[in-house]
Amino acid sequence: MRSFLLLTALLGVAAVAEDGLAAWLRYAPIPHAKSYHKNLPSVIVPLNATAGRPIDTAAYELVDGIKGIFGKRVTLKNETRDDPNLPAVTVGTVEAYAEAGGDVSSVPELIDDGYYLSVAGPSVLILGQNERGALYGTFQYLERLAQGKVSDTSFASNPSAPIRWVNQWDNLQDGGTHGSVERGYGGDSIFFWDGRVRDDLTRASQYARLLASIGLNAVIVNNVNANETILTQENMDGVARIADAFRPYGIQLGLSLNFASPQSLGGLDTFDPFDERVISWWGEITDELYERIPDMAGYLVKANSEGQPGPFTYNRTLADGANLFARALQPHGGIVLFRAFVYDHENLNETLDWKADRANAAVEFFDGLDPQFEDNVVIQIKNGPIDFQVREPVSPLFAHLSQTASAVELQVTQEYLGQQCHLVYLAPMWKEVLDFDLRVDGKDSVVSDIVSGRRFNNTLGGYAGVVNVGLNTTWLGSHLAMSNLYAYGRLAWDPSADSVELLQEWIKMTFSHDQEVVDVITKMSMESWPAYENYSGNLGIQTLTDILLGHYGPNPASQDGNPWGQWTRADADSIGMDRTVWNGTGNAGQYPEEVYQMYENIDTTPDNLLLWFHHVPYTQRLKSGKTVIQHFYDAHYRGSATAQTFVSLWKTIKGKIDKERYEHVLFRLVYQAGHALVWRDSITNFYYNKSGIPDEAGRVGNHPYRIEAEDMELDGYEPYLVSPFEAASGSHCIVTSNNSTEGRASTPLKVKNGKYDIAVNYFDQAIGNSTWRLFLDDDLVGEWKGDLEYILGRAPSPYIDGQTAARITFKHVHIKSRSTLSIVGIPDGMEPAPIDYVSILPEGVID
């Protein structure tokens, strides 16, 4: 009964308001729900259910799901049914079903976590190889029902890989440079606050439920940049409570570790992995954790990267470091995921060393270590060689590890891809990675087969998704971004799944069965990654974001001239990294022969990776016949134009989605449309300034509808030179003369009488909440505040730059000829009410 009450409490939240908390598990009524009643079960029969375990959870999930979707109450029968024709759902393990006298001869072979689902009218059989598998099968059955799929079926489903984990980059404390959740845009940590585990772990239980519903099986609950205090007695007790919250859903808990903990926490004078005291210390800590959490999944370790300690301090190898933890885990059956994200961020020198290349680091550090890792070590490899860019080639390290299992690290949180403020559906990108054939030894070597263990006959391997949910009821900060979490889980289970089919499953369960709703969200989502790539970074140049600050707004110059290694090597004549063997960094040579030959040769390198592998003049012709620079111009205009269509598309389904979620999504799509223009102008102006080559279409730098703020009549405002220059339309904006007096910028309008859209581009810094008022003559058109830092969840910035640039548009404004437009800016805190420009746009025109 306790399980039932808890689950009902969790599900009941969605009935109060459609705030996103239930995500795709709303169990909302489907069209014509009552007409299905005769084909639905009336009884739930859980086999060998124990309170707080997955079979028990499955039973109550079925009760709530069938009631929510169809309005039909079903009863729970806690003993084996004696009538095989009874309209019942029987749920349990294969073993329990056989022990109860069931016929398992027709059940296909199942592996750990696999399940068998048989639906014959109202008689349903859900069997798992283990309890977790039975729960997965239950969720699959309910998700079919939630999509209106009630027809008879019979099939088995096995996971593609044993490791289907989530990484949460949650910090024990808020503050610092990365807040409560590093690269998290959905609010504070659901696990930690003020240096300890939260008292209320309701959201942890809800999270486990979501993850189990898509076939995931473990969560690393703390940041890879780990704080050693996660291992204090109080916090080990606390993480045991998190594990308790996860356990009803079959989700296991794992921890990120700080390599130097024996010294920084344990009081030793060393953290050398060969020192017997260090070995004993880790063994004792691991024993203590398993006493508290007998089903703990294992550890995640980031070592010798971006300031994190590791074995290099003592001239030990990465294998030595990984094996330290692996051996401590072996008596308990645990696994260590050891990150391949290892590079020197302090000494890489772009200017002095043409062959220096961060993309080479993983292979250079791990090559030759393959036979040395313990069997319970899995190398966790980012999908690309750099860092979750809008497009990268597959990491070559997957081809270098045959005796050691590997897992692909994918990023659900959109660190470089719009931080959930821009719609970017990531499944098509991930599919390109998982379907890529590395041709190891001239044989089929698809990435998904490598990480599953099939290609090299490894028993371990799989997936690690960096998700970073928070306390926001949308989980990720955006309702639409949750499609990425859903797709991640589904692809980890079955990498052959289709991106569109996954998306449409999610839409029906999250929003509506209405075909127009399905079509609109499908169109927007499937166009979103190409659009973002077009207006952020093309041809493999990487996401041209500000890599030195929040990884959010445009700042292409920040890529170069520093040791972070995300270089473009752009100068006045040419652009791109030469990663060839014959003349460059040799990165192409890290790939197996067939792939190496493709990337080494500029003629066979795909255009979308041209600048990743080759340094070329701006006038280099692509396979399309366009020059590189003209492609940049065209792509940025095309991508930003696509983003404008998302707003109008979304508006067509108004009234078909609840108001709360409709308005929340609309706000972000309007913001994205404006910020896409900021991206477009910043990148095109930057490369026009650098190359001196004009846009053949005459668009770049030519904005006839704009009025630059610095050209207006100013009272209490003054011009300000923006850095980087391309972040402002004319390199300048205006700011109030001081932080206590309002400013006014005015200009007569030279337009004909009529209706126009008035767009104002401004900067919303995270150091105050300025207010702006827009007037036509003495009439107030509109007012807004600089409070996006409280709404969007993106990385905050105190600067006037591409991260804080924003746009507001007032539609269908009647303007009389010779009217005077004025903007009054009222500063707040340290924010001086900055304005970039105003556009007076004929209706339907985007400048």
Curated annotation (Swiss-Prot):
Enzyme Commission designation: 3.2.1.139
Gene Ontology annotations for the cellular component aspect, listed alphabetically: extracellular region
Gene3D superfamilies referenced in this protein's UniProt entry, alphabetically: Alpha-glucuronidase, C-terminal domain, Chitobiase/beta-hexosaminidase domain 2-like, Glycosidases
Species of provenance: Emericella nidulans (strain FGSC A4 / ATCC 38163 / CBS 112.46 / NRRL 194 / M139)
Family: Belongs to the glycosyl hydrolase 67 family.
Function: Alpha-glucuronidase involved in the hydrolysis of xylan, a major structural heterogeneous polysaccharide found in plant biomass representing the second most abundant polysaccharide in the biosphere, after cellulose. Releases 4-O-methylglucuronic acid from xylan.
Biological-process GO terms, alphabetical: xylan catabolic process
Coiled coil region boundaries: none
GO MF term (any one): alpha-glucuronidase activity
Keywords per UniProt: Carbohydrate metabolism, Glycoprotein, Glycosidase, Hydrolase, Polysaccharide degradation, Secreted, Signal, Xylan degradation
Cell compartments where the protein resides: Secreted
Name the record gives this protein: Alpha-glucuronidase A
Signal peptide stretch: 1-22
InterPro entries (alphabetical): A-glucoronidase_C_sf, Glyco_hydro_67_aGlcAse, Glyco_hydro_67_aGlcAse_N, Glyco_hydro_67_C, Glyco_hydro_67_cat, Glycoside_hydrolase_SF, Hex-like_dom2
Temperature dependence: Optimum temperature is 30 degrees Celsius.
Catalysis performed (reactions): an alpha-D-glucuronoside + H2O = D-glucuronate + an alcohol
Domain of life: Eukaryota
Pfam families assigned: Glyco_hydro_67C (PF07477), Glyco_hydro_67M (PF07488), Glyco_hydro_67N (PF03648)
pH dependence, entry free text: Optimum pH is 4.0.
Record: glycosylation sites: 48, 78, 227, 315, 349, 457, 472, 534, 583, 689, 738-739, 769
